[in-house]
Every structure is written in C-alpha cells, then in structure tokens.
Amino acid sequence: MKQYFVTGTDTEVGKTYVTCQLLRAANNASLTAIGYKPIAAGCELVNGEWVNEDALNIQQASACANGQTLPINEINPIALTPPIAPHIAANEEGVALTHEKIAEGLNALAAYRPDILLMEGAGGWRLPLTIGSDNTPTHYLSDVVKALKMDVILVVGMRLGCLNHALLTAEAIRADGLIIKGWVANDITGNMTRYQENLRSLKAMLPEPLLAEIPYQTGIEAGTLLSAIEQLS
C-alpha cells in the first residue's frame, strides 16, 4: 500500500478535484484507492450527519476491494461547521485538532488495505491546527504529515502568482524533510495569461516530476492520469 499526502499552493486550487481524479484513475486501472480528508470546514447537516462537499466527492471517488461505500465519517472524521480557517472553527466549536485523531483516521482507512491511500489537506502546507494563548500556532498539519513520514503530491493552481507559491511551498516541504513525489498543474481559471510560459517555468524550477496537467473543466485523457498512477503505485 502506498500512502500520499495531497497539498496545494493555496486554498481553492483544486486539491479535492485532483484527489478524486487520481482515485478514479487508480480504480479504473484495477487498483483500489481510498481518499481521506481528515479536516473539513463548511459542513452542513444532512440526514443527521455533518457533511462537507469535498469529503462527499472523495467518498464517491473511493473504492474498496469489496466494493462497499465507506462511511462519510471515516472519510472525514473532523467535520466543522463554519466555512473558515479550521483552527478558528475548531476553537469556536470546542473541537481538538490533534495528531492522534488524524492518525487514527488514517489507520482506520489503511485497514481496508487499498493499493493507494490519498490524504488530502486543507488550505495550504502550513495549516495551523492549534494556537497558544498569544494566538501563535503551536502545531501545524504539516507536523502531522512529517511525523507520519508521508510522501507529498503538490497541486499547483495555475494562476497569476503560482510560481512564487509553488516554489515556497516546495521549499517548505523539503525543509520538513519530506519527499515531493510529484506535482500536478491544475488549470483553475481557463484564461491564465501566458499559461504555457508559466508551465515551462515551473518545469524548469521544480526538480520533481510533473505527474499530470489537468485542463480547465474539460475531459482528461485517460493516458495522462494513467501515467501519474503508474508513478504513484
């Protein structure tokens, strides 16, 4: 079983979309693949359960060997109501964002023994989990990923500023002693000026492999994601 952490250069860069595309591609390649979003904010009460749209998409894209649909509270064990920064939402709701809770959920999904397990973060790499009395963060989600020694998939949202965001995020991941397995260029606007020039710059500046280039709201060629899955499996 291979486990990866999916992070992004910012919030709203398509982490969930990329995660779901990779899960489906793996399942279509006769592999079992499960997604995990330990923390999600902006949840709504549906049939007695707190549900986040991203977590629901991951649930639908995941597949176990026995074909069962995993419970949403296993895909997303920490569901927060306000659509705000998770550590602020957790503080307001009296919820503890702990390493133990996140690792426990990961281990529960690993027990299904999928070929690939993707854990998706929230926001960017340095997402605060807990803060001290002076509002200074004391723990970050990246600390959990570091402790779990997970390789990282970096989703780059292709928009103005992505070069700086990608380089800084990659530097932070490497500084934490983790391996970037590869990165995904996700076209999130469809109208980025000098898109190809920016993509070429990223290829030149990031030593890690480009796993896939995902176009804006159009079909993805099967071979594109199959190549990514071959590198991940």
Curated annotation (Swiss-Prot):
The keyword Ligase applies. Pathway: Cofactor biosynthesis; biotin biosynthesis; biotin from 7,8-diaminononanoate: step 1/2. Its main location: cytoplasm. The active site is at K37. Its EC number is 6.3.3.3. InterPro entries: DTB_synth_BioD, P-loop_NTPase. Keywords: ATP-binding, Biotin biosynthesis, Cytoplasm, Ligase, Magnesium, Metal-binding, Nucleotide-binding. Transmembrane segments: none annotated. Its cofactor is Mg(2+). It is found in: Cytoplasm. It is an enzyme of class 6 (ligase). It catalyses: (7R,8S)-7,8-diammoniononanoate + CO2 + ATP = (4R,5S)-dethiobiotin + ADP + phosphate + 3 H(+). GO terms for biological process: biotin biosynthetic process. GO terms for cellular component: cytosol. ATP binds at E12, V13, G14, K15, T16, Y17, D54, E120, G121, A122, G123, N186, D187. Mg(2+) binds at T16, D54, E120. GO terms for molecular function: ATP binding; dethiobiotin synthase activity; magnesium ion binding. Belongs to the dethiobiotin synthetase family. Homodimer. Catalyzes a mechanistically unusual reaction, the ATP-dependent insertion of CO2 between the N7 and N8 nitrogen atoms of 7,8-diaminopelargonic acid (DAPA, also called 7,8-diammoniononanoate) to form a ureido ring. This is ATP-dependent dethiobiotin synthetase BioD. It comes from Alteromonas mediterranea (strain DSM 17117 / CIP 110805 / LMG 28347 / Deep ecotype). The lineage of its organism: Bacteria, Pseudomonadati, Pseudomonadota, Gammaproteobacteria, Alteromonadales.
